[in-house]
Amino acid sequence: MDRIEIEIKLNRDRAWLLERLGEMPTDELMMPRTFSEHDPESRWSFADHFVHTTLIERNWNAMFRRHLTGEQGLEPRLRGDGSPQSMDTIMASIHAWTEEWKAEHSGKPFIELVRIGQAVRAETLELLAELSDEDLTSKIPGAPWADGTVGGIMAANADHGRMHYGWAEEDPVSTADSP
């Protein structure tokens, strides 16, 4: 994927998501829609899913920078003895981390969540402008997203927003609460 395709995808999908969420009444935007992967008492709204994607995009930008400066892109996930953590342990820590971010931003007006997302998206586009074509095709060892390249993962931010919108739209909370 080249830089033009990446920028188009990022902008098109961000606009798609903002149009849908921006048209929603506040009560619908903030209504619990999905179950937390971390806290059995917590529920996620469309707004929570939206701000979650900002956290991941910010984290991926840091990963790209580490990788391109010769550091390990993916942060090592090791136990105290130096052996790799299990996937269950890794996912539990990721879910706790994202739940903490969700709680930190819960109840904020949607326009504030958009502003936070705009700041991170600006960083993403600035990074895209700084990267060479070779940088965009550089593979991040162990990265499970997209094709594993910096450019592919960067473009996957767009897919991530649509994926979370879809999960919130399914609304398993209402189904579970129905008699």
Role assignments for model-derived ranges:
Residues D2:
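Short Lys/Arg-rich basic patches
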Residues T26-D27:
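Short amphipathic alpha-helical segments and their helix-coil junctions
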Residues K9, A103-A119:
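A short, structured beta-strand-centered segment in the mid-to-C-terminal lobe
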Residues E37, W97-H105:
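A short small-residue
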Residues E7, N11, A15-L18, M30-H95, ...:
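Short, contiguous alpha-helical
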